[in-house]
Regions:
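Structural signal for well-ordered, non-membrane alpha-helices
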Residues: 20, 40-47
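Short, hydrophobic secondary-structure boundary micro-motifs
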Residues: 32, 54-56, 97
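Arg/Lys-rich, positively charged N-terminal/basic patches that mediate binding to nucleic acids
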Residues: 1-34
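Amphipathic, hydrophobic secondary-structure cores in small proteins
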Residues: 22-36, 40, 60-64, 70-71
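GIY-YIG nuclease signature motif recognition
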Residues: 12, 39, 76
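Enriched for short, Lys/Arg-rich terminal
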Residues: 70-99
Length: 99
């Protein structure tokens, strides 16, 4: 297995900002920061043994989907030297329609 560079697209970064804002309103700044840090650490962990999750070629060629803590869905593709994270969906978002 090889390590790959992690790339978060602007849409994924915007998703993380939205998740932060949503949690910050409900639970406060510290809770929101800690949650985002856990999501980011999980995404960075896709650098090794990257070819995991469910393949969803029906939505986009090479697309993979993984869940995080039962509330977050991460969509990404694995390339030869990098993992490209497209979106990070929170809660019950209808992520299939967003891709």
């Amino acid at each position: 297995m090889k390590r790959r560079h992690i790339v978060l697209l602007p849409e994924a970064l915007a998703d993380l900002r939205w998740i932060y804002d949503t949690i910050e309103i409900a639970a406060g700044n510290v809770t929101a920061i800690r949650y985002i840090e856990r999501i980011e650490a999980y995404c960075q962990g896709l650098d090794y043994a990257s070819e995991r999750g469910t393949r969803r070629d029906d939505l986009r060629p090479g697309l993979r989907v993984v869940g995080f803590e039962r509330r977050v869905t991460v969509t990404f593709t694995v390339e030869s030297d990098q993992v490209v994270i497209f979106r990070v969906f929170y809660g019950g978002a209808n992520w299939e329609d967003e891709l």
